[in-house]
């Protein structure tokens, strides 16, 4: 963190990221090496530069591949108590129901979990940020987790989105992190609260025919230096293969096994399909908005090339063809 901005080797970084669950349509929560490599290669082809390991440490294989291919990481600790604070926010329960909050009986277990997360993965250069977990409200216990990460690692930043719901320990997170805040809302927040840089740890919820208006966020990274990007929710549909009555394989979601209750197809939020892990049409929007090189024309037919890569040389070679010659409009 330099002058209120997250920087990598002295340059302001913009996260063009995705949230990624560990998932295979064949083996469930244990994707194989070929599947993970396909994910990484697909990301590189489509200008994705970062992964948030939502919401737990992934197989070590992923971290090694991110080191090799050059994908930045938010390494997330295994923590989520979504239901308890959501019930509190809806008025169903008292604040005492929320965990871990300030409850001392959670402290030792959570510090151990954070320490395990750090010790296993500390030597991976792909990791730029440690995350205390996901959507677990706020409180002293999670703040102490963040302090443990800082004590163990003087060079990486610490992330936690939950302070958005509970500002009692606002310094838990080194950056302001929110979910699904409109681009205009981010700009307004930064105008009123300029103390920290801002990321969307989840945005552009990719369920169904989605990812429209993504450009409002990526354009904001150019206009507002303290907005430093975000992580799409999420990378791949979590769907499982099953045979129909004719013996043909198809991809299933909640309820297709007679399971009740179920969230239905709410696990299908990816910019890649399940199964063969192919990019969906939504990926075209992602690739365009995450592009690092853009060309703009003005009214005098002069074009400007912008290179947003942090460390790639700015010398570029061009080849152009004139398809039609016309007079300049008056």
Model-derived features: positions:
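Extended substrate-binding grooves/exosites of carbohydrate-active enzymes
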Residues: 1-304, 308-316, 321-329
């Amino acid at each position: 963190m330099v002058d209120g901005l997250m920087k990598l080797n002295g340059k302001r970084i913009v996260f063009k990221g995705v949230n990624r669950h560990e998932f295979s349509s064949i083996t469930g929560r244990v994707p194989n090496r070929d599947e993970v490599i396909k994910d990484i290669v697909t990301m590189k082809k489509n200008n994705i530069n970062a992964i948030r390991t939502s919401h737990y440490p992934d197989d070590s294989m992923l971290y090694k591949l991110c080191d090799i291919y050059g994908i930045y990481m938010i390494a997330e600790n295994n923590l989520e108590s979504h239901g308890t604070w959501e019930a509190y926010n809806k008025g169903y329960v008292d604040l005492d129901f929320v965990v871990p909050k300030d409850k001392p009986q959670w402290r030792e277990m959570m510090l151990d979990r954070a320490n395990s997360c750090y010790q296993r993965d500390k030597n991976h250069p792909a990791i730029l940020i440690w995350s205390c977990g996901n959507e677990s409200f706020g409180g002293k216990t999670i703040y102490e987790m963040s302090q443990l990460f800082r004590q163990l690692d003087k060079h990486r930043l610490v992330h936690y989105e939950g302070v958005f719901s509970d500002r009692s320990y606002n310094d838990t997170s080194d950056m302001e992190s929110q979910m699904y805040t409109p681009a205009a809302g981010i700009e307004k927040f930064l105008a009123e609260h300029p103390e920290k840089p801002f990321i969307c740890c989840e945005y552009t919820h990719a369920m169904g025919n989605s990812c429209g208006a993504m450009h409002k966020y990526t354009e904001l990274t150019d206009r507002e230096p303290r907005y430093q990007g975000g992580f799409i929710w999420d990378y791949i549909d979590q769907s499982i293969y099953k045979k129909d009555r004719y013996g043909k394989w198809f991809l299933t979601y909640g309820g297709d096994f007679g399971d009740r209750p179920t969230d239905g197809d709410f696990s299908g939020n990816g910019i890649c399909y399940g199964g063969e892990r192919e990019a969906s049409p939504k990926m075209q929007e992602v690739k365009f908005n995450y592009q690092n090189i853009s060309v703009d024309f003005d009214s005098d037919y002069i074009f400007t090339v912008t290179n947003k890569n942090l460390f790639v040389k700015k010398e570029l070679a061009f080849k152009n063809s004139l398809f039609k010659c016309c007079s300049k409009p008056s």
